[in-house]
Amino acid sequence: MTKRKSANLDAPIWFDGTNINEALFCDEFLNSRKIIFANGAFFTPDGRVTDDLPLRGEIYEKLKCCAVNNIPRKITNILEVMKLAAHVEDFAPEADRIHLANGTLKLDGSFTEGRPNIVRSRLPVAYRPDAPAPVRWLSFLDGLLYTEDIPTLQEFIGYCLIPSNKGQRMMVIKGNGGEGKSQIGAVLVALLGSNMKDGSIGKISENRFARADLEHILLCVDDDMRMEALRQTNYVKSIVTAQGKMDLERKGKQSYQGWMFARLLAFSNGDLQALYDRSDGFYRRQLVLTTKEKPAGRIDDPDLAEKMKAEVEGIFLWAFEGLQRLVANNFKFTESQRTRDNREAVKRDSNNVFDFLESEGYIRLKADCTISSKDLYEIYRMWCEENNLTPLKRRSFSESVIASQTKYNLEYCNKITNAAGRRVWGFFGIEAIAKPNINGFSDVSERTYVPDRWQE
């Protein structure tokens, strides 16, 4: 009969001289460390564990005194057991405070030093209320953006400091290239650390797994947004407006409910357009800032980003001021007339129905008049042809006009009488002026209706 090895009195309680008891190891480890496992991730007083290599290193330091085989596999097994031992059902975000390198700052301005508690996220910047003003940063913004648009950026960056989507806005900063707008992203890395990630709005719109990559993230930056219109917008809209948990899915795994509070920021040479979504909601959620023209002969400083990063404590105070202003305004962003005009221009560029309804010489908005949907679309096609524009499909056109009923005092119904005397779908409130292919007139190509007497 084989005798069991005598116990080593100096050995840890979880090691019997031959084997490691993972459960006992985890109990001892968790008694000496503040760590929990929730919502698919480990959290410590430093925030979410984004790389488990340091944690594996700590476990290795404790195991190396024990002569056991295949330590890497043992460490992996211990981490899996630790997920069970440290598991808590949920770890809700705290939107009323910002955890910083040297303490916690609440939105009311009160600050508590130290980092005793486990937190969801901790920014790598320290709170120094007497930090000098970020002179280089402010000078950079003054050269990049119009003065009245800088408060909007200030509020949006402040908005990204807390895990909340109450503002329900994303931001697009648009320029012709070379202005230096992407330097903002480099500074935000210093401000947010691992709580920010690079991404692609196009990928988010197309890939149902991309949303899960933004779980626990405060900000996703698309440094060079591609110009193609989005085929789908529902994923992007759901992220911008998410309040609480949403359904997330990772490849090969069952979908689950996860916290989503990522904000979206894109730098681009063009607009964020939708291929099929003509709804007001998609464009209403965009804050579109345009940059100033790059001055001729300007010499760019290759070290500007590093110099601005050195001002990160002052930049944090500047952003926190914007956040407090946003909260005081019930999460309604400050918008200049230029910003509002930018959004309207993006909306109209993607949907020429608005320009058509406001055009002259084709239709007239008149309360006691009616027009069938078919006739209205034919006039719209003629307007597009004469203005060298691409017409929408019939269904998209009708949906756009229906969505604009309130704005233009229209009523969509099936009580319209067409030229043949039949009841069809159409609109109250529109009178036809131009009449292509209406009332029997047609020709080889579509053109404006010409009276018979003009053809004699």
What name fits each language-model region?
Residues 30-57, 98-99, 104-218, 287-289, ...:
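P-loop NTPase catalytic core of nucleic-acid-dependent motor ATPases
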Residues 76, 192-194, 199-208, 230-233, ...:
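Positively charged interface segments
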Residues 210-253:
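Conserved nucleotide-sensing/catalytic segment adjacent to the nucleotide-binding pocket
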Residues 216-219, 260-264:
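Loop/turn-to-beta-strand initiation segments
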Residues 309-351:
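Phosphate-handling catalytic cores of nucleic-acid transaction enzymes
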